[in-house]
Amino acid sequence: MTSRTEAVKAYLLDLQDRICSALETEDGGARFVEDAWVREAGGGGRTRVIGEGNVIEKGGVNFSHVFGSGLPPSASAHRPELAGRGFEALGVSLVIHPHNPHVPTSHANVRFFIAEKEGEEAVWWFGGGFDLTPYYGNEEDCIHWHRVAEQACAPFGADVYPRYKAWCDRYFHLKHRGEPRGIGGLFFDDLNEWDFDTCFAFIRAIGDAFVDAYLPIVQRRKNTPYTPQQREFQEYRRGRYVEFNLVYDRGTLFGLQSGGRTESILMSLPPQVRWGYDWKAAPGSEEARLTEYFLQDRDWLGQ
């Protein structure tokens, strides 16, 4: 393990600790349970799960560090120069599914890949971001989420937030449904356009921003009363979350194709979901407004 990899690993382990602590404090009831695991083909990780709390119905904050002699197809398909290289992949990935349908689901990920081959220069990149999936939209929450994202990106250039916001909108899109998964945030991959230290500083800024972006929204919405019908709608919309993760998500596909730990990879799936044949929201309802207004390609900071 190189000094670069060691520095990234130390940061990611600390990030996992800090996020878990903040979420436990906010929930006020449930605690994370840790499952340390070893990957037979190389590496391991710390899966931490939480559930049936005061706020969080199901959540997980995972750290993994895996390595192998060759990259799986999901990682090398768009980068053919990586074929035949050994690799290390480190990351923290989290998903939080709250009980209350007025509290959005959140997802964040920061990761580092390095691929090496004897006699050749190492190829490395960072990836990550965070995105928000509301069930009942609120403009105040959307603006706050994107404002924190913009502030995290600002020291690295005025063009960074718009680029990675647009990438997030493109990435978290269910092509077969013709709709986005949520209201976006940031997404980036293959990041090595700056030197290593700057790229590493950037993912630290993104990782550190998650709690500031999410917890104020949780605090505003966690005590909002809700009906059984609103809970049912939340479960229906969670179905879209499952569809995206199992069909499109590169992290999920990479994990499964590289022999990753299935329980940790599928931790992101919500605990209760429903599908209904050709279900449609009533015209003029809050449920209809979610897709008509919030789940659109919108400039939340420019309106």
UniProtKB/Swiss-Prot annotation:
Spell out the subcellular localization from the entry. Answer: Cytoplasm
Task: Identify the pathway.
Answer: Porphyrin-containing compound metabolism; protoporphyrin-IX biosynthesis; protoporphyrinogen-IX from coproporphyrinogen-III (O2 route): step 1/1
Which annotated residues bind a divalent metal cation? 97, 107, 146, 176
Query: Sorted alphabetically, which SUPFAM superfamilies does this protein's record hold?
Result: Coproporphyrinogen III oxidase (SSF102886)
- What is the uppermost EC class here? oxidoreductase
Q: What does the record give under GO molecular function?
A: coproporphyrinogen oxidase activity; metal ion binding; protein homodimerization activity
Q: Which domain of life is it from?
A: Bacteria
Which catalytic residues are annotated? 107
Q: Which PROSITE patterns match?
A: COPROGEN_OXIDASE
User: Per the record's keyword annotation, is Oxidoreductase included, yes or no?
Assistant: yes
PANTHER family hit by this protein = COPROPORPHYRINOGEN III OXIDASE, MITOCHONDRIAL, OXYGEN-DEPENDENT COPROPORPHYRINOGEN-III OXIDASE, MITOCHONDRIAL
HAMAP family, alphabetically?
Answer: Coprogen_oxidas (MF_00333)
What is this protein called in UniProt? Oxygen-dependent coproporphyrinogen-III oxidase
Species source reads: Pseudomonas putida (strain ATCC 47054 / DSM 6125 / CFBP 8728 / NCIMB 11950 / KT2440)
